[in-house]
């Protein structure tokens, strides 16, 4: 019996706890390399947020709901709506900021392989299909030269890159921000 050390449960308990800790940290760190999420309201000045909260609900059967159509068939923000609905006011501290924002694509241009290289990112699905479109300070023009194959506009995306305050006029809608995307990916179930 001399020289025999009884086996202790301590090392196995320690190893199990260590393994569990590593697994838990590993699952939490899966997205640790990503920037924290930027909320869409961070792109809107406080004064616009207050005006939006005070605005009556839009009746989609009203004359204002018909929007303003351009010669090319695009739908623009209607001037008959409260000013906040076509506000181009921005948040200066967001300029040249690296962000990660979630939203839905409205494709504008594609490459030869059919990948979207230029699109609006909007806060809710079908935003530029429904009338009226979001305010310009709630639309982001995304430039993504690598392109992303989009199966439909109801696919939520994460877009990471440098946000710029930039007024963009387009036949479909106007935007107050543009983003040079470094990474665009589809939101996965594990993100939720």
Annotate each predicted stretch with a short phrase.
Residues 18-27:
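Sec-dependent N-terminal signal peptides
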Residues 32-192:
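OB-fold and OB-like single-stranded nucleic-acid-recognition modules
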Residues 4-5:
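Acidic, Ala/Val/Gly-enriched low-complexity intrinsically disordered segments
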Residues 8, 15-18:
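Positively charged n-region of N-terminal signal peptides that target proteins for export
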Residues 11-12, 31:
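Low-complexity, intrinsically disordered segments with a bias for serine/threonine
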Residues 9-10, 22-23, 109, 167:
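Residues at secondary-structure transition points
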């Amino acid at each position: 019996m001399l020289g025999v050390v009884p086996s202790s449960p301590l090392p196995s308990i320690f190893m199990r706890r260590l393994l569990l800790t590593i697994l838990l940290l590993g699952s939490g760190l899966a997205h640790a390399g990503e920037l924290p999420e930027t909320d869409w309201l961070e792109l809107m000045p406080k004064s616009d947020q207050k005006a939006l909260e005070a605005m009556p609900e839009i009746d989609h059967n009203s004359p204002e709901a018909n929007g303003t159509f351009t010669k090319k068939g695009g739908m623009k923000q209607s001037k008959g709506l409260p000013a906040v609905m076509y506000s181009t006011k921005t948040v200066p501290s967001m300029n040249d900021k690296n962000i990660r924002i979630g939203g839905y694509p409205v494709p504008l241009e594609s490459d030869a392989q059919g990948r979207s290289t230029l699109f609006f990112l909007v806060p809710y699905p079908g935003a530029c299909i429904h009338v009226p479109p979001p305010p310009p300070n709630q639309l982001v023009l995304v430039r993504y030269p690598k392109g992303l194959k989009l199966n439909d506009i109801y696919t939520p995306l994460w877009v990471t890159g440098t946000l710029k305050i930039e007024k963009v006029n387009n036949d479909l809608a106007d935007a107050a921000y543009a983003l040079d995307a470094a990474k665009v990916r589809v939101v996965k179930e594990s993100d939720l």
